Amino acid sequence: MHKSTLETHHQPIMPVLALVLATFFWGSSFITVGSALEYTNPLTLVMLRFGVAAFFVLLMLKGRIADIPKRTWKAGAACAFLIYLGYTTNAAGLMTLQNSESGFLTALYVPITPLLVWVVFGKAPTKGAVCGVMMAFAGLVLLANPFTLSFSNNWGEWVTILSALISAVEIMVVGRVAPGTQARQLAFTQLFFTAVFAAVGLAVATAAGVPLKETTFNTTVVGGILWLAVIVAFVQVLLSWAQRYVPAGRAAVIFAMESVFAAIIGWFAGESLGTAGIIGGVLIVGGILCGEIRLPRRKAAPKELSS
C-alpha cells in the first residue's frame, strides 16, 4: 500500500492534534478571563483557577498522591514556578499595554523557543521548522497589529518580553521532563504548585501594600473560575502527555494557534476581525503545516545499465 503524498515526520499525529486541541481551549478562555477580572485580581484568579483544577486532576488520580514519585514533584514544582512567573509578568505588563500589544509581545516565545533549544541542547532547527516559525510569527504580527509599540520608557513592554522568555523556557522544560513522568501526575503537581506560588505571591503583595482589586464572589466569578479550572485541568493533562512526543520548538509554533482561536471566538462574540487578521490566521496554520508535514523524498532514478 502506498503512503499518502503528504506524511508527518518524526512523531505520530495524535500528540500534534492534542496540542492543537489544548490551544483551542486556551484561546476560548480569554473572554471568560476578561469577564472574571472585572471582579477580581490576576493573583487571586490564578490561585483559585489552578487550585480548583488541581482538585479535578486529583479526582482523576483517585486521590493517590502518595503514588506520585519525588522526581515528578520536583519537575512539577519547577514547571509551576515558570508558569506562575509567566502569568505574573504578563499581568504586570498589561497594566501599561493594550491587549493587542501584549498578545504580540507574549507571542515572541514562538521564535525564542527553538533558539533556546538550539543554544541549550545544541539541536539546530530544521529548514521546515524555521519556515514554520517565520510564518507563524508573521501571522501573529498581523493578528496583533503591534505597530504602536515604542520600546522607550514603557516598562510594560520589557516586562511582557520577559514573560515571553519565561514561557519559552517553560515549554522547553516541560518537553524535557514530560517523557519521564506520568501525564496526570505531572499535570497535578504543576497545577498544585502554581496555585501555591500564586497564594504566596498574593500574601506578599497584600503585606507589601500592593493595590489589588478585591474579589467579589458573584456568579460571573464563581462560574468563570469553575469553567477555567475545567479547561486548565484538561489542558495540562493534554500538554503533559503530548509534549513527550513533540519537540519544544514545534510545540511553540502549534501554540501560536491560541491567538487564532481567541480571534475567531472573539469574532463570534462581536469583536472585529479584519482582512489582516484573517491573513494572519492563515499564516499561522501554514506555519504549523510547514513544520509538521513534508513531501516524501523522491527516489533516485535508477542508473542506466551499460551495454
Regions found by a protein language model. Give the residues of each.
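Specific transmembrane alpha-helical segments of multi-pass solute transporters/efflux pumps
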Residues: 25, 29-30, 58-106, 113-114, ...
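C-terminal-most transmembrane helix of multi-pass membrane proteins
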Residues: 2-6, 17, 48-51, 145-146, ...
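Hydrophobic transmembrane alpha-helices of multi-pass small-molecule transport proteins
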Residues: 57, 77, 125-146, 164-167, ...
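Glycine-/small-residue-enriched transmembrane alpha-helix faces in small-molecule transporters
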Residues: 1-47, 89, 150-176, 198-200, ...
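Helix-helix packing/entry segments at the starts of transmembrane helices
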Residues: 46-48, 102-108, 174-196, 232-267
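C-terminal transmembrane-helix exit sites in multi-pass transporters
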Residues: 56-67, 110-134, 260-279
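Hydrophobic alpha-helical transmembrane segments of multi-pass integral membrane proteins
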Residues: 14-18, 44-59, 128-138, 155-162, ...
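Loop-to-transmembrane-helix transition segments
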Residues: 14-23, 61-90, 155-163, 212-234, ...
